[in-house]
């Protein structure tokens, strides 16, 4: 299993609560629709960054496939424009 964690900041002036809801509604339903994506959680952060994404994948290959999957790319189009910065970490379990 691979765990994928991403921390984001949003652009200045973006409503953080509304943005996190859009991101959550776009990405969390992908579980069960993209092979190898086992779990997805998106939450507003209270310290350091604006929100955190936590996900689990069956394998490294399934994480790689997720990144370019058409459903993931379509979901990103709904919110990518209000993201400012991103830090990610992936690790095996």
Where are these regions (language model features)?
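Short S/T/G/P-rich N-terminal loop/turn motif that feeds into the first structured element of a domain
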Residues: 1-51, 58-68, 91-93
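Conserved short beta-strand edge segments in small beta-sheet-based binding/regulatory domains
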Residues: 36, 76-91
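Short, conserved loop/turn and helix-capping segments at secondary-structure boundaries
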Residues: 69-73
